[in-house]
Amino acid sequence: MAFQGHQARKRFGQHWLKDQTVLDRIVAAADLQPSDRVLEVGPGRGALTERLLSSPAAAVQAVELDRDLVDGLRERFAGDPRFSLRQGDVLELPLQLEDGVAASKVVANIPYNITGPLLDRLVGRLDRPVEPPYQRLVLLVQKQVAERIRARPGHSSFSALSVRMQLLARCTTVCPVPPRCFQPPPKVQSEVIQIDPLPADKRLPSDIARRVESLLRQAFLARRKMLRNTLASLAPEPQLQALAAAAGFQLHQRPQELAPQVWVALARGLNQGIDAASADGHDHGDGSGQGESSPGGARDQI
């Protein structure tokens, strides 16, 4: 094969998954059906690809950044017409399959240095979710990221990512993956997670979603500060206290202590206040305009 002797490259974050049990668990979690069209990110030398093609899936399209692996992958799977391959950066390429049809499921051993941006592309954010949503994503990620996704309020790992993902999808753990399961072994623990994005009719209304996203950016950029301080620009303190009481939290709390639904309740309260202000012609000083700006460079900080 063309990639025999190819060594994993640090600059691509390559760690070949070699554990047969973990490979089987990933494919089992994907629950592939004859109607499924699979997008595989980072096939490497094809260990997971082989199992995906052993499933009843209708098509498997792999996206590989490393040019030196492309010929070997095409040679290895040349006999299966369901397989296709594109070389390039998954963060930049269009994600439709070669025939222009969207994939129904995503399976990936993600290079850990692109996990955040890739989740943005595959799941989206509250104010711009991926449309249409994938039915399921099964991803091998760094354990620290998995912990942040599933963290509960008050846990040290709880973050804006926790709130966002728990409002956009059902996220569950498939299995832990220790370093010995890879070649070469990474220096961190890993985990396979299953993400089932919510259908459009189960998501937040767009105005509430935009408001929650704005609140998360504002609050978690200063996660050690009390909400009395980080939310001060939204309303005078008496009004802010009333909003907090209605949403079910106190202003001396910090953002990582609030459950996802509390953020939703706060967003609804703020939006209702803005609607009331618009109706009676008064300015309640909620400062809503500043929250609609693009997160820009703040994206990776939260």
Swiss-Prot record:
Catalytic activity entry: adenosine(1518)/adenosine(1519) in 16S rRNA + 4 S-adenosyl-L-methionine = N(6)-dimethyladenosine(1518)/N(6)-dimethyladenosine(1519) in 16S rRNA + 4 S-adenosyl-L-homocysteine + 4 H(+)
Any GO molecular function: 16S rRNA (adenine(1518)-N(6)/adenine(1519)-N(6))-dimethyltransferase activity
PROSITE patterns linked: RRNA_A_DIMETH, SAM_RNA_A_N6_MT
SMART domains, per the entry: rADc (SM00650)
One term under GO cellular component: cytosol
E.C. no: 2.1.1.182
InterPro entries found in the cross-reference section: KsgA/Erm, rRNA_Ade_diMease-like_C, rRNA_Ade_Mease_Trfase_CS, rRNA_Ade_methylase_Trfase_N, rRNA_adenine_dimethylase, SAM-dependent_MTases_sf
Subcellular location: Cytoplasm
SUPFAM superfamilies (UniProt xref): S-adenosyl-L-methionine-dependent methyltransferases (SSF53335)
Pfam families: RrnaAD (PF00398)
Residue ranges crossing the lipid bilayer per the database entry: none
Region listing for Disordered, in residue ranges: 275-302
List of residues binding S-adenosyl-L-methionine: H15, L17, G42, E64, D89, N109
Keywords: Cytoplasm, Methyltransferase, RNA-binding, rRNA processing, S-adenosyl-L-methionine, Transferase
Similarity field: Belongs to the class I-like SAM-binding methyltransferase superfamily. rRNA adenine N(6)-methyltransferase family. RsmA subfamily.
UniProt function note: Specifically dimethylates two adjacent adenosines (A1518 and A1519) in the loop of a conserved hairpin near the 3'-end of 16S rRNA in the 30S particle. May play a critical role in biogenesis of 30S subunits.
HAMAP family, per database record: 16SrRNA_methyltr_A (MF_00607)
Protein name, as recorded: Ribosomal RNA small subunit methyltransferase A
